[in-house]
Regions:
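N-terminal alpha-helical signal peptides/signal-anchor transmembrane segments
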Residues: 42-67
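N-terminal soluble domains immediately following signal/targeting peptides that reside
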Residues: 59-66, 70, 125, 139-142
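Conserved non-transmembrane functional hotspots
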Residues: 58-61, 68-82, 87
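N-terminal positive-inside, membrane-proximal cytosolic segments immediately preceding the first
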Residues: 1-16, 28-30
Length: 185
C-alpha cells in the first residue's frame, strides 16, 4: 500500500509539474507573440512616418514659393504681384498606424523612450495641422473679394509660421527614422 501511495504521489507531482510547464510554455508563447506584434506595430508606425516625410518634402518647395510671393507682395505693398491665384498643396500626414499601435495590446511592449519621441513628433504634427487649417480658412475667406495688402498680411504671417512648422515636423519625423532624439522639446 505504501508503494502505491508513493507511486500516486509521484504521479501527482509529475502531473502538477507537467501542468506548470504547460502554463509556462503558454505564457512564453503569448509573450513572444505580443513582442512580435509590437515589432510589427513599430514597423508600421515607422513606415507611416517615412510616408509623412515624403509628403512634407514633396510640398515644401511650393509652400516656400507661395510664402515668398506673398512676402514680396506685402513688402512692396503691391497685391498685383500675386497674379491671378495662389495655388499650393499641403501634406496630409497620417497618424493611423500610430493611433492603432497605442490602442493595441502591443502598446506595453513598445520601447517607452521611442513612444515618447514619437508622441512628441505627432504633437508637433497636430499643431501644424491646426495652423494649416487656419491658413486655408484665411486664404479661402479672401477668394473672390480682391486681395488687398490688409487681407494678405495675416495670411502671410500665418504662412511664415506654417513654413517654419513644416520644416520642424519634417525634421522631427526624419530624426525618428534616423533614431536620433529630437532637437528641441
Amino acid at each position: 500500500m505504501r508503494t502505491r501511495v508513493a507511486e500516486l504521489a509521484v504521479e501527482a507531482v509529475m502531473v502538477v509539474f507537467a501542468v506548470l510547464v504547460a502554463f509556462a510554455v503558454d505564457e512564453w508563447r503569448e509573450e513572444r507573440q505580443l513582442r512580435d506584434f509590437a515589432d510589427r506595430a513599430r514597423a508600421a508606425v515607422e513606415a507611416e512616418i517615412a510616408a509623412n516625410v515624403e509628403e512634407f518634402e514633396a510640398t515644401a518647395a511650393a509652400l516656400d514659393s507661395v510664402q515668398a510671393l506673398l512676402g514680396e507682395a506685402v513688402r512692396n505693398d503691391d497685391p498685383s504681384l500675386l497674379g491671378g491665384s495662389i495655388a499650393f498643396s499641403l501634406p496630409e500626414p497620417s497618424s493611423a498606424a500610430w493611433r492603432a499601435s497605442q490602442g493595441s495590446v502591443a502598446a506595453p511592449y513598445l520601447d517607452y523612450g521611442w513612444v515618447i519621441r514619437v508622441s512628441r513628433a505627432y504633437e508637433v504634427s497636430e499643431t501644424y495641422a491646426r495652423i494649416a487649417e487656419r491658413a486655408i480658412d484665411d486664404m479661402s475667406s479672401v477668394i473672390g473679394t480682391g486681395a488687398t495688402i490688409e487681407t494678405m498680411q495675416p495670411i502671410y504671417g500665418r504662412l511664415v509660421i506654417l513654413s517654419d512648422m513644416h520644416g520642424q515636423v519634417r525634421d522631427r519625423f526624419q530624426a525618428l527614422l534616423a533614431g536620433e532624439p529630437p532637437t528641441s522639446p
